[in-house]
Design a protein with these regions (language model features):
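A short, charged, Gly/Pro-tolerant segment at domain boundaries
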Residues: 112-130
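Glycine-rich phosphate-binding loops that contact phosphosugars or nucleotide phosphates
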Residues: 1-99, 103-113
Length: 130
């Protein structure tokens, strides 16, 4: 949502079939970011593979780099993961992913900041209009 408010055309897709269809429709001007803490989520890896075949830039956020993923990922961003946190008793295992997205967002907003801030203000104004 924050990237959309900054003027980017963003889709967040979790359905495996839609992920593959969207990946087939991207092109060289697109960036596809896949998230799999285990690095083994077949649906995510398949989607990234299809996106790479479509000439998109491909990034994987993971805590575990599986052999071969570097063949279809332009960048692999490792995030922290503590074993057994997936039961939700302490800190969410997704916390490191949220932090990484905050870092990426801050970096993106810092470059050509005035234009992006204006787009952000425009989108907020559009939401407030009745």
């Amino acid at each position: 949502m924050r990237l959309m408010r900054a003027g980017l055309d963003v889709d967040v897709v979790t359905d495996p079939h839609i992920m593959k269809m969207r990946a087939a429709l991207v092109d060289k001007d697109c960036l596809v970011i896949g998230i799999s803490l285990s690095g083994k989520t077949k649906e995510v890896l398949d989607c990234l593979h299809v996106a790479k075949k479509s000439n998109a830039k491909v990034v994987l956020l993971t805590s575990n780099i599986e052999p071969g993923v570097d063949k279809f990922c332009d960048e692999i961003l490792r995030v922290a993961y503590v074993k057994n946190l997936d039961f939700g008793m302490k800190v969410s295992p997704q916390l490191s992913i949220l932090i990484m997205f905050d870092i990426l967002y801050a970096y993106y907003m810092e470059r050509e900041a005035s234009a992006k801030i204006q787009k952000y203000k425009d989108t907020i104004s559009a939401l407030r209009e009745k």
